[in-house]
C-alpha cells in the first residue's frame, strides 16, 4: 500500500510539473471593463477579413483544430518548420516572401529556432502558396525593406543582408546603433522598420524604444528613454511598425497573454494606444466561418498598398505549445496570410481648426476600384470624430450628403466630435449596405505632420575657470529644419524642480547636431547622483524630455 501511495504521489508530481511547464507559456489577461462598450470597427482585430485559398485539405500535419485548412495559403511543407517574415513585390511582378525556418526533424523541435535559416520564397499571388527558391543564409525574424539608396535590406537578429536586387547576391553585415546615453530596453532584437517621407527610417526594437536612421543603412540613433508600449502588465515582443498616407501604426504582441495592442502616431516617436485587441487566437477564419484555430499567432508583418494602407497580415503560427513541437511528430509551424480591410480614403474639406464649438464638418469619401461611396454605404450608420468617441459608438452624425464626381461628400453635425488640440487623425466608423464594417482615418488640414524632432543626450559636467559647466548635445532627427529652442537641465527635490542650467539651441537642419555649453548653477554637489531631466522647449511647448540618473563630475 505504501509503495502504491508513493508511486501515485510521484506520478501526481510529474503531472503537475508537466502542467506547469505547458501553461507557463500562456496566461489569461483581464480586459478593461470599458472594452465591452467598443463598437464594430473600434478594434484593429475587426479589420481581419476571411482567409483565401483554393486547396482545403486535412492530408497534412497539424492538430485537429487546424484541420482541414488552406494548405496553399502562405507557406508550409512537411520538411521545414517556417516562422516569421514579410512580403515585397518585385519588378518581376511576383511576390517575394522572406521567411525563416528550420528542419522539422531537428532534434530540438521548435526550439531549433535560434539556428534558423532565411528563405527567399516566391508566389504569383499575395496570399500564396509561396515556394522556397533559395536560402539567403542564417538568421531569425527577418524583415525586408528598401533603403534610401534603393538597396534591399533583410534584417535578422544581430545582423542584416543587403542586395541590389531581390534575386541578386546578398551580403551579410551589421547595423550600427547609438543608444545616445539611453538604456536599451530588452536588447536589440525583433526590430521593425518604417520609411519616412524623406526615405529615412524609424525603427522600433523589441523593448519599445524608438530609433531613427537617415537612410535605413547608416547608424540608428535612439530617441526615447522608455518603452512606447501600453502601460500594462505584458511580456511584449514582435513589434511591427508601418506608415501610411495618414499616420504611423504600431502593433505589439504580449506573447504570454496571447493578446496584441495597437498604437498610432503622427511622427513615429510619440504614440497613443487605441483600445481593444489588435489580434489574438481565432482571427484565421474562412469565408464559411470555419476557423483555423492556431495556438499562437506571432511575428505579425503587413503588406501595404500604394497609399501605405495595410491590406494583408502575415503571421507565424503554430498548432500547439512550442515545447510540444517535437521532431518527426504531427506538429509544426507555418506562415499564413490574412487579408485586411484597408479602410476608406477620407479628406476633411474644412480648413479651420475643429473645436467643440464647430457646427459642421465636411468629409469627402473617395471612390476606389470596386467601391462606390454613393451607392455602397449605409449613410445613417456613419459616425465621425476623435477615436475616443467613435470607437464607443459616439461622435458626429450625418446631416447631408452630396455627390462630387465619383466621390461622396458627407456633412456631419459637429456636435460631439471630441477633437482636441492633440488630435491628428479623426476616425470614421460605419457600415456598408450589406452590413459589413467600414472605417477610415483623415488628416486635419491645419496640422503640420512633418515637424522637427529635437533630442538631447546626457549632460556632461566639467570644471573651468568660470566654474561648473554643462555641455549638452542636441540633434534634430526631424525631416525639416528646426527653429531656435531652449534646453534646460534640472532635477526634482521634495516635489520641486531645481534648475541646473539652461540655454538656447540654434536652428538646426535635418539630422544636424550641436553642442550647447551651459553655465551650471551652484545647486549640485560634486560626486552626487541626481535624477536629471533634460527638457527641450519651443516657447512653453515641451518638445522632448530625457530622464536619467547621473553623477556630477563622476
For the regions a language model picked out, list residue spans one by one.
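Bacterial Sec-dependent N-terminal signal peptides
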Residues: 1-26
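Carbohydrate-active catalytic/glycan-binding domains of CAZyme proteins
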Residues: 2, 25-347
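Boundary/junction segments of secreted and surface-exposed precursor proteins
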Residues: 343-364, 451-459
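Short proline/glycine- and polar residue-rich coil/turn motifs
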Residues: 400-406, 505-514, 553
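Short, surface-exposed loop/turn segments at beta-strand-coil junctions that are enriched for proline
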Residues: 415-420, 521-526
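Asparagine-centered strand-capping/turn motif at beta-strand->loop junctions
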Residues: 474-479
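Intrinsically disordered, low-complexity Pro/Gly/Ser/Thr-rich segments with frequent PxxP/GP/PP motifs
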Residues: 496-525
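Terminal connector regions
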Residues: 522-554
Amino acid at each position: 500500500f505504501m509503495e502504491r501511495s508513493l508511486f501515485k504521489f510521484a506520478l501526481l508530481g510529474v503531472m503537475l510539473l508537466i502542467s506547469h511547464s505547458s501553461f507557463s507559456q500562456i496566461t489569461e489577461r483581464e480586459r478593461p471593463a470599458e472594452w465591452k462598450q467598443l463598437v464594430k470597427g473600434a478594434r484593429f482585430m475587426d479589420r481581419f477579413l476571411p482567409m483565401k485559398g483554393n486547396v482545403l485539405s486535412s492530408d497534412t500535419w497539424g492538430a485537429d483544430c487546424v484541420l482541414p485548412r488552406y494548405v496553399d495559403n502562405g507557406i508550409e511543407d512537411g520538411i521545414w518548420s517556417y516562422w516569421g517574415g514579410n512580403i515585397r513585390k518585385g519588378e518581376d511582378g511576383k511576390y517575394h516572401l522572406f521567411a525563416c525556418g528550420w528542419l522539422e526533424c531537428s532534434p530540438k523541435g521548435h526550439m531549433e529556432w535560434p539556428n534558423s535559416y532565411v528563405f527567399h520564397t516566391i508566389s504569383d499571388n499575395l496570399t500564396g502558396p509561396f515556394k522556397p527558391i533559395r536560402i539567403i543564409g542564417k538568421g531569425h525574424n527577418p524583415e525586408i525593406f528598401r533603403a534610401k539608396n534603393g538597396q534591399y535590406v533583410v534584417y535578422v537578429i544581430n545582423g542584416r543582408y543587403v542586395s541590389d536586387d531581390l534575386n541578386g547576391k546578398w551580403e551579410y553585415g551589421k547595423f550600427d546603433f547609438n543608444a545616445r546615453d539611453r538604456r536599451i530596453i530588452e536588447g536589440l532584437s525583433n526590430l521593425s522598420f518604417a520609411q519616412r517621407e524623406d526615405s529615412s527610417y524609424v525603427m522600433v526594437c523589441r523593448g519599445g524604444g524608438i530609433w531613427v536612421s537617415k537612410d535605413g543603412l547608416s547608424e540608428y540613433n535612439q530617441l526615447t528613454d522608455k518603452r512606447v508600449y501600453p502601460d500594462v502588465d505584458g511580456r511584449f515582443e514582435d513589434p511591427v511598425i508601418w506608415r501610411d498616407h495618414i499616420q504611423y501604426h504600431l502593433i505589439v504582441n504580449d506573447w504570454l497573454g496571447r493578446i496584441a495592442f495597437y498604437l498610432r502616431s503622427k511622427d513615429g516617436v510619440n504614440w497613443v494606444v487605441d483600445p481593444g485587441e489588435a489580434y489574438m487566437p481565432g482571427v484565421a477564419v474562412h469565408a464559411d466561418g470555419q476557423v483555423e484555430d492556431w495556438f499562437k499567432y506571432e511575428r505579425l508583418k503587413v503588406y501595404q498598398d500604394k497609399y501605405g494602407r495595410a491590406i494583408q497580415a502575415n503571421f507565424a503560427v503554430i498548432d500547439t505549445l512550442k515545447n510540444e513541437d517535437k521532431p518527426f511528430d504531427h506538429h509544426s509551424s507555418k506562415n499564413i496570410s490574412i487579408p485586411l480591410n484597408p479602410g476608406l480614403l477620407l479628406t476633411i474639406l474644412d480648413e479651420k481648426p475643429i473645436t467643440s464649438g464647430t457646427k459642421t464638418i465636411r468629409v469627402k469619401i473617395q471612390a476606389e476600384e470596386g467601391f462606390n461611396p454613393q451607392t455602397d454605404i449605409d449613410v445613417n450608420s456613419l459616425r465621425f470624430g476623435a477615436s475616443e468617441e467613435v470607437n464607443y459608438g459616439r461622435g458626429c452624425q450625418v446631416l447631408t450628403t452630396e455627390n462630387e464626381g465619383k466621390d461622396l461628400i458627407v456633412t456631419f453635425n459637429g456636435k460631439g466630435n471630441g477633437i482636441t488640440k492633440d488630435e491628428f487623425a479623426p476616425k470614421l466608423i460605419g457600415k456598408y449596405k450589406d452590413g459589413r464594417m467600414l472605417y477610415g482615418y483623415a488628416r486635419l488640414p491645419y496640422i503640420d505632420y512633418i515637424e522637427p524632432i529635437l533630442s538631447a543626450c546626457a549632460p556632461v559636467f566639467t570644471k573651468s575657470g568660470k566654474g561648473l559647466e554643462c555641455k549638452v548635445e542636441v540633434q534634430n532627427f526631424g525631416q525639416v529644419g528646426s527653429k531656435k529652442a531652449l534646453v534646460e537641465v534640472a532635477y526634482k527635490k521634495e516635489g520641486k524642480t531645481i534648475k541646473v542650467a539652461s540655454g538656447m539651441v540654434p536652428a538646426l537642419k535635418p539630422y544636424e547636431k550641436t553642442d550647447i555649453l551651459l553655465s551650471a548653477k551652484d545647486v549640485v554637489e560634486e560626486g552626487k547622483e541626481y535624477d536629471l531631466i533634460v527638457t527641450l522647449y519651443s516657447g512653453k511647448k515641451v518638445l522632448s524630455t530625457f530622464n536619467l540618473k547621473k553623477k556630477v563630475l563622476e
